[in-house]
Amino acid sequence: MRMELKMMGNVNKSNKTNEYILRRHKKKRKKKLIIFSILLISILVTLCFKHPFFNVKIVEVKDNKSIKKESIIKSSQISNENNIFYLNLNNVKNNIMSNPYILDAQIKRKLPNKIVIHIKERVALYYIEKDKKFYIIDNNGYVLEKKDNIKNMKLVRVDGIKKKDYNVGEPIFEQGNIRKNFMKNLASLIDKKDNNYEIAIVNIENMNNIQLKYRNIQIIIGDDEDLDKKLNKAFSILLQKEEIRGAKEGYINVSFKGNPVVFIK
């Protein structure tokens, strides 16, 4: 009787061991199946993404004003051989930003085969003349290009900057420079007016004696404090009095508080 019970115990123990082994084998097979499935899906997805269906067919440029769409697309170096998923958007942005007239570029994918480029442009407002060349400057003192002729470009000449070289794609001032801050402030005021208030020249050699030129009239600003109020005073006089606007020579001094001093010949 004891022998039979012992044998039955061994059988039960053996059955339990076999069940445990079977469960382990099942788990291993299941794990292998999951890994294989993931690998297969990954391969299929990769092959799918590399399919020509996802090659770039359309490049759309938005918010460009003065720069031609074709020029932006060319500088982006995007071709119809580029896969939309494998296209390096940072490289595309850097390529586009090599154009000095572009302040910023945002590139987005639009499935299945479209790239959208949003452009923010720099605006040409000033110029500096040196060695019979014209350096086009934006409101932040950034050199946009060098030209031999600026005919039909409504720009304000900047005098009084002493610098040996001007390099396209680089700023003419260091960050925080008082002249840079003034040019940016002036730009925000005159850019809102037709023809830039018709200001032809701004002289910033002496930042305590800033002067503007309107036709034949010199506008003496003094320092850059209360610039908007000083400009309003000067141009209120100019717009109200034809004899001043048409004078052969003269000046309006708004560098101090109180009524401006006006002199014409």
From Swiss-Prot:
Residues in the Extracellular compartment per record: 55-265
Residue ranges of the TM segments: 34-54
POTRA domain boundaries: 54-122
An individual GO BP term: FtsZ-dependent cytokinesis
Gene3D superfamilies to which the protein is assigned, alphabetical: membrane protein fhac
GO CC field: cell division site; plasma membrane
Function statement: Cell division protein that may be involved in stabilizing or promoting the assembly of the division complex.
Family membership noted in the UniProt record: Belongs to the FtsQ/DivIB family. DivIB subfamily.
Protein name as catalogued: Cell division protein DivIB
